[in-house]
A protein has these predicted regions:
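Residue-level recognition of short loop/turn positions
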Residues: 1-2, 92
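Substrate-recognition element of Asp-dependent hydrolases with the DxDx(T/V) motif
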Residues: 4-12, 16-46, 56-59
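Short, structured coil segments at secondary-structure junctions
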Residues: 48-50, 96-97
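Short, charged, surface-exposed secondary-structure boundary motifs
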Residues: 57, 61-67, 110-116
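Conserved Lys-Pro-Asp/Glu-containing loop-to-beta segment of HAD-superfamily phosphomonoesterases
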Residues: 61-86
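Acidic, Mg2+-coordinating phosphoryl-transfer loop and its flanking beta/alpha structural elements
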Residues: 82, 87-119
Length: 136
């Protein structure tokens, strides 16, 4: 959620809300899978965007991902994880066996723990792009 859907002040764009509504109209089930322990904040954002949610997910561990299947009754092959953090969102999604999309963070301001991880993500991504070719 943080830096993927909303900025560090927990605000989102009108376009995001419209996109979420369009996806729902096409019968796509939407979940926020957040490591945030702030259930009230996650619940508020999810409610405003018309999404289901799981907070305190402990990504990259698999419990949160499994909860999505339990709550949605959707097969793993129909799930996609979209996130801005390589070592939580993407690694967890890949370990769980779902498709993943790594996006750029919305804001430059990040939580302390995320700031610590970003240099290591850059090392991994640099090696990946060197091997596979950069996609922009």
């Amino acid at each position: 959620m943080d830096n993927t859907l909303v900025d560090n002040k927990y605000t989102y764009t009108k376009e995001l809300k419209e996109w979420m509504q369009n996806l729902k109209e096409h019968k796509i089930k939407l979940f926020i899978l957040s490591n945030s322990p702030m259930g009230k904040v996650v619940k508020r954002i999810a409610g405003e965007l018309g999404m289901n949610y799981i907070y305190n997910a402990n990504k990259p561990f698999l419990k949160g991902y499994k909860s999505i299947i339990e709550k949605s009754k959707v097969k793993k092959k129909h799930i996609m994880m979209i996130g801005d953090q390589l070592f939580t969102d993407i690694w967890g999604g890949n370990r769980f066996g779902v498709k993943t999309i790594l996006v750029r963070p919305i804001a430059s301001t990040e939580a302390f723990i995320t700031k610590i991880k970003r240099p290591f993500e850059k090392i991994v991504l640099k090696k990946y792009y060197k091997k596979k070719g950069e996609i922009d």
